[in-house]
């Protein structure tokens, strides 16, 4: 629903059985944007059939890339963007079924390479 000033008064989208409502900043509804230049402490994670397409659409819509799409050791392909309001969004798709044993081994290798 458009706001009188041309902004977004109300928008919603459905992810599985979860409905998410968003709007532009509006003091009368206690909807405040974060101070410019900051990033929210939360991360919205969206499972999708096509991580790369979701990432590309977000970038074209004005999001900033924080991590380009890449395969992760736990079997997902994921990317992270920051929207113009400072919120981070992760797009993920399952690309490989990883056994618990392989996951433990890969996690050990991943975290040992970070020290």
What kind of feature is each model-predicted range?
Residues 1-49, 53-82, 92-115:
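Vicinal oxygen chelate
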Residues 85:
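C-terminal catalytic core of tyrosine-transesterase DNA break-rejoin enzymes
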């Amino acid at each position: 629903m458009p706001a009188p000033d041309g902004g977004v008064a109300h928008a919603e989208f459905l992810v599985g059985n979860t409905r998410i409502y968003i709007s532009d900043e509006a003091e009368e509804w206690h909807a405040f944007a974060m101070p410019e230049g900051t990033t929210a402490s939360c991360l919205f994670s969206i499972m999708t059939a096509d991580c790369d397409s979701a990432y590309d659409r977000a970038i074209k819509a004005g999001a900033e890339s924080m991590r380009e799409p890449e395969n992760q050791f736990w079997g997902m392909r994921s990317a992270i963007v920051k929207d113009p309001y400072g919120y981070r969004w992760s797009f993920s798709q399952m690309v490989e079924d990883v056994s618990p044993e392989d996951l433990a081994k890969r996690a050990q290798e991943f975290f040992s390479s970070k020290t």
